[in-house]
Amino acid sequence: IANQKDGCTLLEITEALDIPKSSAFDIVKTLLYKKMIVEDQNHGKLKYKMGINAFIIGSGNIERLDLVEAAKNQLIETANHFNATAFLAILDNKMVTYLYKYEAPHRIVTNANIGTRKPIYSTALGKCLLAFQRKPEVIKDILKEIDFKPLTEYTITSPQKYLKELKRVKNIGYAVDFQEDSIYQICIAAPIFNHNKNVVAAISCTFLYDTNLRIKEIGEEMKRIALTISKKLGYIDDTGRRNIHGK
């Protein structure tokens, strides 16, 4: 249907898919219900064209591809520099969803891959994606639905402590997960913003737990890299005054 400017008739769909007309009708009916396609009778024949929801989904995927393209080279360079595993993630249905992953040659092995979904409260990525939301009600609504189950002995399980942690993250401009999601792992993340200054993603590097890890230095570097990526997405830095990256 998407490839036909004037849309398709039910017969054309049936022939293209090589399925019974009744089966094609069931598919069309479902797509109409989901607003993925719409009916068009302008030319005397009933045809089906792409609907608004198909456009919205397609646009969302394009934005995600643009996001990965903007961040990819920076993440590869950063992971190799720190000998770490780098991630790019977004907030999707109140879960952290990984869009991109790069592992340096001698990196720490992680169980997260592209498409993996993790709780927002146990990851540094999640902290960034929530702490920098511009509307306080968004944070409150998400916090209400979080079931703070301990994933390790270090997981924050108190809504009050987590809210305090979010305030700290917003103040310093980056987030740290101290073995809160996976034991023996530390994750350091920073937020990515779009042209409207909305947080749209976050990047992170994962390290093996080490008391000598230079967390502040790495955090500042992650902020710098995230800012570079944000500018590729049209974000304009507020030079000369405190900006949303905590500077």
Residue spans for each PLM region:
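Conserved segment of winged-helix/HTH DNA-binding domains
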Residues: I52-A79, T110
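Extended hydrophobic
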Residues: L151-T228, K232, H245
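Short, solvent-exposed recognition segments
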Residues: I108-E180
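Short hydrophobic alpha-helical segments used for membrane anchoring or interfacial signaling
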Residues: L88-N93, K101-Y102
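N-terminal helix-turn-helix
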Residues: I1-R64
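Amphipathic alpha-helical regulatory segments at dimerization interfaces
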Residues: A16, A70-H81, I172, T228, ...
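Short amphipathic alpha-helical signal-transduction/dimerization elements
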Residues: A2, G126, L130, R134, ...
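Short, highly charged C-terminal tails/helix-capping segments
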Residues: Y235-K247
